């Protein structure tokens, strides 16, 4: 895919004005960094950062019984929440592989708003549309809404300055307005910090982003690119589809079984996942913290006593811990517990690492 083939978000030119460097994410050209990933990461941990994640998908399932239909297909149990709350969930295939992980917003019994990953939106919409009963529609709204994430300890201060709602529980959302423009405000995020995701209409994106940026800077924050978003989520052990989740990596292996409604009568992949859970997965997601100096990356062999016992799925330098960290799928048969020492083959060099159970840093989402 060439640069000219990449899709662009609603404030792409503004990112250029801000000095962003760009990279491809899910078929979209998105800002990877502005002043620098480490500084942007630290801003989110200490003050506040503003991300443009408008490449994320958006879709609406609507019609009589929409919530019931979504509950019978996606893994998590919508019965655990109510209108005004959101839920992390997964769209699985019959064999238990993950087509995508996504957020489901319970708007009403007849309306569920979904935010899938950019590259998987079309697949999720197609799967749901093909299975939808009469009267239930599944509409791809990828370019109807922008998504801006305001994340960090001062995120509430930023939204309050614009008159947007901030007093809500984690994973709650509210429909509001700024300057006459409708905005959905969600107490969600992908950083492990207190934060919000703000969804204005696509056409309203630039004035909303500029207003948020002004308040972020007033709070000693800065715009942050998707490079920082990745280091932040890796520190939290949050999975990224294509890395820790895929059609070959199940929720049981990726430690996202908490997002599966095991007691529900049905959801896609239920039989396969129940079987894997009962038997025990052949591999499990763990964290690795480098003992030796070095940076870990995806796809590197993990060794114990020179024998392969797994592979890294994501890796980075942790700006918080100031060491290399990784997420890795480790063979359960190897019996590796937190505290065990392994080695990662980094281009022929054996980098010693300690096995840890994620997250690497405490969550502060509440």
Swiss-Prot record:
GO CC terms of this entry = cytosol; glycine cleavage complex
Task: Kindly state which reaction or reactions the protein catalyses.
Answer: N(6)-[(R)-S(8)-aminomethyldihydrolipoyl]-L-lysyl-[protein] + (6S)-5,6,7,8-tetrahydrofolate = N(6)-[(R)-dihydrolipoyl]-L-lysyl-[protein] + (6R)-5,10-methylene-5,6,7,8-tetrahydrofolate + NH4(+)
User: Cross-referenced InterPro entries, in alphabetical order?
Assistant: GCS_T, GCS_T_bac, GCST_C, GCV_T_N, GcvT/YgfZ/DmdA, GcvT/YgfZ_C, TrmE/GcvT_dom1
Q: Extract the coiled-coil ranges from the record.
A: none
- Keywords on record: Aminotransferase, Transferase
**Record-level Gene Ontology MF annotations:** aminomethyltransferase activity; transaminase activity
GO biological process annotation, one example: glycine decarboxylation via glycine cleavage system
So what EC number does this one have?
Answer: 2.1.2.10
Q: Give the disulfide map.
A: none
Q: How does it assemble?
A: The glycine cleavage system is composed of four proteins: P, T, L and H.
- Entry function: The glycine cleavage system catalyzes the degradation of glycine.
Family, similarity comment? Belongs to the GcvT family.
Task: From the Swiss-Prot or TrEMBL record, give the protein name.
Answer: Aminomethyltransferase
Q: Which species is this record about?
A: Nocardia farcinica (strain IFM 10152)
């Amino acid at each position: 895919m060439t640069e000219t083939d990449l899709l662009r978000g609603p404030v792409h030119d503004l990112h250029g004005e801000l000095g962003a460097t760009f990279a491809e994410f899910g078929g979209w050209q998105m800002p990877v960094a502005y002043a620098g990933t480490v500084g942007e990461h630290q801003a989110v941990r200490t003050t506040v950062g503003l991300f443009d994640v408008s490449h994320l998908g958006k879709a609406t399932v609507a019609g009589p019984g929409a919530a019931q239909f979504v509950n019978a297909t996606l893994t998590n149990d919508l019965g655990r929440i109510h209108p005004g709350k959101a839920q992390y969930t997964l769209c699985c295939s019959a064999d238990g592989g993950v087509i995508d992980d996504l957020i489901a917003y319970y708007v009403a019994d007849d309306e569920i708003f979904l935010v899938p990953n950019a590259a998987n939106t079309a697949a999720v919409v197609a799967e749901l549309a093909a299975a939808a009963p009469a009267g239930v529609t599944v509409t791809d709204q990828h370019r109807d809404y922008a998504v801006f994430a305001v994340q960090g300890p001062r995120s509430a201060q930023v939204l309050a300055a614009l008159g947007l709602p901030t007093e809500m529980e984690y994973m709650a959302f509210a429909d509001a307005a700024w300057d006459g423009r409708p905005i959905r405000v969600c107490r969600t995020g992908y950083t492990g910090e207190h934060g919000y995701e703000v969804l204005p209409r696509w056409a309203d994106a630039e004035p909303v982003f500029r207003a948020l940026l002004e308040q972020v800077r007033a709070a000693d924050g800065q715009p942050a690119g998707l490079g920082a978003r990745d280091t932040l989520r890796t520190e939290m052990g949050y999975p990224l589809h294509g890395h820790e989740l895929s059609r070959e990596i199940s929720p049981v292996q990726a430690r996202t079984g908490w997002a599966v409604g095991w007691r529900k009568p049905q959801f896609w992949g239920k039989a396969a996942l129940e079987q894997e859970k009962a038997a025990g997965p052949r591999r499990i997601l763990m964290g690795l913290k480098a003992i030796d100096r070095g940076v870990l990356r995806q796809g590197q062999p993990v060794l114990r006593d020179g024998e392969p016992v797994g592979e890294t799925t994501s890796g980075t330098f942790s700006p918080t811990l100031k060491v290399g960290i990784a997420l890795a799928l480790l063979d359960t048969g190897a019996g590796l517990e937190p505290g065990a020492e392994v080695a990662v083959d980094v281009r022929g060099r054996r980098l010693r690492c300690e096995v840890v159970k994620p997250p690497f840093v405490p969550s502060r989402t509440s």
